[in-house]
Amino acid sequence: MSTLHKVKAYFGMAPMDDYEDDYYEDDDRVPARGYRRPREDRFEDEAYPRGYDDRAREYDEPAGYRGGFDDARFEPRLRGPREFDRTPPRFGGLRGSTRGALAMDPRGMAELFEAGSPLAKITTLRPKDYSEARTIGERFRDGTPVIMDLVSMDNADAKRLVDFAAGLAFALRGSFDKVATKVFLLSPADVDVTAEQRRRIAEAGFYSYQ
């Protein structure tokens, strides 16, 4: 169908039937009546218009882009020491650091209570209530130095035992000395305990280990 014939048909100067017949004869892409295209072909045309792939290839890849899977992004990162790991401990090791009444010096104890020492027979009593005052009196009467530990007693009973021990020491010409808080030393008359020895007993905490 010539271009002139098409123009004539457009303005009504040629029969329309001829125009339509010639038009459909020239268009090879139109399928015959009753023909149905496969579903796969129709889906591809709808999802991917013609020329899509060509236009997509016109865009350049970003500079520095590396194709494939970037494993480096998922590798474990090495972490440096955290802040609290670098912080030095506020307290040193506890082993060997005990001082005062809680410390136990074996050498000092050996010298203080060695055989022949006035304190070699020393004993420690921890009464629970005032009813144990008799035991304290008997040990002291027999000439044994007594450490009286009243820490576990209530203040009322502890005060009564202190008064009892002080009167006992006075009656038997002994001595009654405070070693630590609620801890007292009863010494018979023939046992002379110096202030230095009492201090060493308190610092070594000897009464806590008997």
Swiss-Prot record:
GO BP of this protein: division septum assembly; FtsZ-dependent cytokinesis
Key words of the record: Cell cycle, Cell division, Cytoplasm, Septation
Positions with biased composition (Basic and acidic residues): 37-60, 79-88
Principal localisation: cytoplasm
The keyword Cell inner membrane belongs to this UniProt entry's keyword annotation: no
InterPro entries xref list: Cell_div_SepF, Cell_div_SepF/SepF-rel, SepF-like_sf
Keyword match Chloroplast: no
GO cellular component assignments: cytoplasm
Disordered: region residues: 22-72, 79-98
One Pfam entry name: SepF
Compartments it resides in: Cytoplasm
Family recorded in the similarity comment: Belongs to the SepF family.
Assembly and interaction partners: Homodimer. Interacts with FtsZ.
Its biological purpose: Cell division protein that is part of the divisome complex and is recruited early to the Z-ring. Probably stimulates Z-ring formation, perhaps through the cross-linking of FtsZ protofilaments. Its function overlaps with FtsA.
PANTHER family: CELL DIVISION PROTEIN SEPF (PTHR35798:SF1)
Name listed for the protein in its UniProt record: Cell division protein SepF
